[in-house]
Amino acid sequence: MAMLNPCHPGETLRDDLAAAGLTVTETAARLGCTRQALSRLLNGKAGISPAMAIALERLGWSNAAYWMRLQAAYDLAQERRRQAA
């Protein structure tokens, strides 16, 4: 059964960064994005794009398909909530 209210993938990534002891600035540099772009993702203001999913995969954080599935599940749940309102 699908989760009715999955967390934003940025929350998962934020937990991963904390567990690895990495800062937002350091991680943004490794990902090749701005600190602001990563911060928006971590705070649920932006989603994980295919390019970001691949960048995360290259750094060893699971695979790109995993990140895209998290984003798709989140987006679908959000749309279901909007349509139910």
Tell me what each language-model feature is.
Residues 1-2, 82-85:
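Short intrinsically disordered terminal tails
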Residues 66-83:
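Short amphipathic recognition helices of helix-turn-helix/homeodomain-type DNA-binding modules
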Residues 1-22, 65-69:
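A short, Lys/Arg-rich alpha-helix, primarily the initiator
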Residues 22-40:
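Short alpha-helical DNA-recognition segment
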Residues 50-69:
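DNA major-groove recognition helix of helix-turn-helix/homeodomain DNA-binding modules
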Residues 36, 46, 65:
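Key DNA-contact positions within bacterial/archaeal DNA-binding proteins
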